UniProtKB/Swiss-Prot annotation:
Belongs to the class I-like SAM-binding methyltransferase superfamily. RNA methyltransferase RlmE family. Its main location: cytoplasm. Its EC number is 2.1.1.166. S-adenosyl-L-methionine binds at G60, W62, D89, D105, D134. InterPro entries: RNA_methyltr_RlmE, RNA_MeTrfase_FtsJ_dom, rRNA-MeTfrase_E, SAM-dependent_MTases_sf. The active site is at K174. This is Ribosomal RNA large subunit methyltransferase E. It holds the Pfam family FtsJ. It comes from Cupriavidus taiwanensis (strain DSM 17343 / BCRC 17206 / CCUG 44338 / CIP 107171 / LMG 19424 / R1) (Ralstonia taiwanensis (strain LMG 19424)). Keywords: Cytoplasm, Methyltransferase, rRNA processing, S-adenosyl-L-methionine, Transferase. It catalyses: uridine(2552) in 23S rRNA + S-adenosyl-L-methionine = 2'-O-methyluridine(2552) in 23S rRNA + S-adenosyl-L-homocysteine + H(+).
C-alpha cells in the first residue's frame, strides 16, 4: 500500500510539474533541460563555435538544449549549427538533429576510441570546450554503496575532462549530497581553478541532486 501511495504521489507531482509541462510545450524530452538552461544562463557555459560532449546523454534533453544554443548563432547557416555536440550513453537515444550519438560504455576501449575519433573530427584535432555529465547510478538505498557509485561516475567525468578539455574549458556534473560529496568537491578544486555548486530551481525540492561546475583546468605537474 505504501509503495502504491508513493507511486501515486510521484505521478501526481510529475503531471502537475510546471517544468514537465514546459518541456512538453517546447519539445524537450525531459524536464532536465531546464536545469542546464538555468545553469547556462547564470554561468554562460554554451557559446557559438564550441565543441561539447554530453556524457550520460539519454534521453537527450541536455543535447537538445546545447544544440539549440549553437543553432541560435548568427554564424549557423544552411541548416548547420555553429559548433558540435557529441553525446554518449549506455542506453539508446532517439536521434537529435545535428547531434552525433554513440551508444556504448566509454570505459570500453573500442567505444572510447570511437568517441575520441568523433570528438577529434568535430574539433578539427583540437581539444573540447565543455563536458556535460548528467550520469547517475542506480541507487540502492545503502548510503555507503550509493556514495561510492556517485563518486565513481564523477571520477570518470573528471578523468575525461582532464584529458580532453581546453585549458579554458569547463565541466558540469550531476552529483548528490551524501557521505562522498565533500571528497568530490575537493577533487574538482584540485583539477580546476574555479569551482561552483549549483542547485537550479528545476531540481525537485525533495531531490538531493546538485551540480558541480569546474572551469579553467589547473596545470598538471
Amino acid at each position: 500500500m505504501a509503495k502504491n501511495k508513493f507511486n501515486h504521489s510521484w505521478l501526481h507531482d510529475h503531471i502537475n510539474d510546471p517544468y514537465v509541462k514546459m518541456a512538453q510545450r517546447e519539445g524537450y524530452r525531459a524536464r532536465a533541460a531546464y536545469k542546464l538552461k538555468e545553469i547556462d544562463e547564470q554561468d554562460k557555459l554554451i557559446r557559438p563555435g564550441q565543441v561539447i560532449v554530453d556524457l550520460g546523454a539519454a534521453p537527450g534533453s541536455w543535447s537538445q538544449y546545447a544544440r539549440n544554443k549553437l543553432a541560435d548563432s548568427p554564424r549557423a547557416r544552411d541548416g548547420r549549427i555553429d559548433g558540435a555536440v557529441v553525446a554518449i550513453d549506455l542506453l539508446p537515444m532517439e536521434p537529435v538533429a545535428d547531434v552525433t550519438f554513440i551508444q556504448g560504455d566509454f570505459r570500453e576501449e573500442s567505444v572510447f576510441r570511437e568517441l575520441e575519433s568523433v570528438v577529434l573530427d568535430a574539433s578539427g584535432g583540437n581539444k573540447i570546450d565543455l563536458v556535460l555529465s548528467d550520469m547517475a547510478p542506480n541507487l540502492s538505498g545503502v548510503a555507503s554503496a550509493d556514495a561510492a557509485r556517485i563518486e565513481y561516475l564523477c571520477d570518470l567525468a573528471l578523468e575525461f575532462a582532464q584529458a580532453h578539455l581546453k585549458p579554458e574549458g569547463a565541466l558540469l556534473v550531476k552529483c548528490f549530497h551524501g557521505s562522498g560529496y565533500s571528497q568530490i568537491v575537493e577533487k574538482f578544486k584540485r583539477q580546476f581553478k574555479v569551482v561552483a555548486k549549483r542547485k537550479p530551481k528545476a531540481s525537485r525540492d525533495k531531490s538531493s541532486e546538485t551540480f558541480i561546475l569546474g572551469r579553467y583546468l589547473k596545470t598538471v605537474d
